[in-house]
């Protein structure tokens, strides 16, 4: 694996492969990799001739009260993991490489980006969409890989690609989980031992929603209330968002009919906010074709 910081150098290296007709897969990350990231790499490695991973802690997606400096970083460890995963190129630019001057051009999806996490992190998804667009412009991948754990981010990127006719296929990869069901996340390292034990309640909240919907509850507010109460039984858990949404548009759902619904959870443990989600097919939808 070759580590490159320069945009020009990466473009030159990839141009040779592109001329040879090789497909390129991109795995964008902010580093401090875990097994979830490596599942993205595994998928990319199996579906492309050339795999590029990027590590860039993007200042545009951090708000004024979010500590960019404290975001965990360990480039040597990440390089070792990516090498073992079969990555061909690691693009690891500095801020001066990506943003040599203050950014005037911003990619913003104001409707999708102001919902849910965007409502409490204004500008966050504009920062994400802008840096992902810039990475797409630099790498020009055939496919790009993102985890389904950050479902809102994934849908924003999909819509951005569609609206801007960007020539890349966005591949969503199912969430990788730890032994107790907690979604793998770089944020998990911030949890204390007690908070980590308590965090096992989060995936159980998804199970509770599935149980309620499977039992015939069709009122979305009742499901959201039931899951909130379930999560609140854990003293260290502070549910911030328990929301049933349309999986494609992220618009609120009031009644659960035959279409699948998306449950999004944002639960805080101390200073750490954990995200999780599940697309749930109502019982009537699951068995509609059995006849």
Swiss-Prot record:
Binding site for (R)-pantoate: 61, 153
Residues forming the catalytic site: 37 (proton donor)
E.C. no: 6.3.2.1
Residues that coordinate or bind beta-alanine: 61
GO molecular-function term, one example from the UniProt record: pantoate-beta-alanine ligase activity
Functional pathway: Cofactor biosynthesis; (R)-pantothenate biosynthesis; (R)-pantothenate from (R)-pantoate and beta-alanine: step 1/1
Annotated binding of ATP, by residue: 30-37, 147-150, 176, 184-187
Enzymatic reactions: (R)-pantoate + beta-alanine + ATP = (R)-pantothenate + AMP + diphosphate + H(+)
Stored Gene3D superfamilies: HUPs (3.40.50.620), Pantoate-beta-alanine ligase, C-terminal domain (3.30.1300.10)
Localization per Swiss-Prot or TrEMBL: Cytoplasm
Main location: cytoplasm
Cytoplasm among keywords: yes
GO biological process, one term: pantothenate biosynthetic process
Top EC class of this enzyme: ligase
Gene Ontology cellular component terms for the protein in this record: cytosol
Alphabetized InterPro entries for the sequence: Pantoate_ligase, Pantoate_ligase_C, Rossmann-like_a/b/a_fold
One Pfam family this sequence matches: Pantoate_ligase
Keyword terms, alphabetized: ATP-binding, Cytoplasm, Ligase, Nucleotide-binding, Pantothenate biosynthesis
Subunit: Homodimer.
NCBIfam families: panC
Family affiliation: Belongs to the pantothenate synthetase family.
Note from the entry: The reaction proceeds by a bi uni uni bi ping pong mechanism.
Role: Catalyzes the condensation of pantoate with beta-alanine in an ATP-dependent reaction via a pantoyl-adenylate intermediate.
Name the UniProt record assigns to this protein: Pantothenate synthetase
Gene this chain is encoded by: panC
């Amino acid at each position: 694996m070759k580590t490159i910081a320069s945009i020009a150098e990466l473009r030159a290296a990839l141009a040779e492969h592109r001329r040879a007709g090789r497909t390129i897969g991109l795995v964008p990350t902010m580093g401090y990799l875990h097994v979830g990231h490596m599942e993205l790499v595994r998928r990319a490695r199996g579906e492309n001739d050339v795999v590029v991973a990027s590590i860039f802690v993007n200042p545009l997606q951090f708000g004024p009260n979010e500590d960019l400096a404290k975001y965990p970083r360990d480039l040597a460890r990440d390089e070792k993991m990516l090498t073992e995963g079969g990555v061909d190129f690691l693009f690891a630019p500095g801020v001066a490489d990506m943003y040599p001057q203050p950014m005037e051009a911003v990619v913003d999806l104001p409707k999708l980006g102001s919902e849910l996490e965007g409502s409490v992190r204004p500008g966050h998804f504009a920062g994400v969409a802008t840096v992902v667009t810039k990475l797409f412009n630099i790498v020009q991948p055939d496919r790009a890989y993102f985890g389904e754990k950050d479902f809102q981010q994934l849908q924003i990127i999909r819509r951005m690609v569609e609206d801007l006719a960007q020539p890349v296929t966005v591949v969503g990869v199912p969430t990788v989980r730890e032994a107790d069901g907690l979604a793998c996340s770089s944020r998990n390292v911030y949890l204390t031992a007690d908070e980590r034990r308590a965090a096992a309640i989060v995936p159980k909240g998804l199970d509770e929603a599935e149980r309620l919907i499977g039992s015939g509850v069709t009122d979305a507010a009742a499901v959201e209330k039931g899951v909130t109460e379930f999560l609140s039984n854990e003293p260290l858990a502070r549910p911030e968002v328990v929301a049933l949404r349309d999986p494609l548009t992220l618009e609120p759902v009031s009644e659960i009919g035959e279409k699948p619904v998306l449950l999004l959870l944002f639960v805080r443990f101390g200073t750490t906010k954990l995200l999780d989600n599940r697309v749930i097919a109502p019982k009537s939808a699951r068995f509609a074709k059995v006849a």
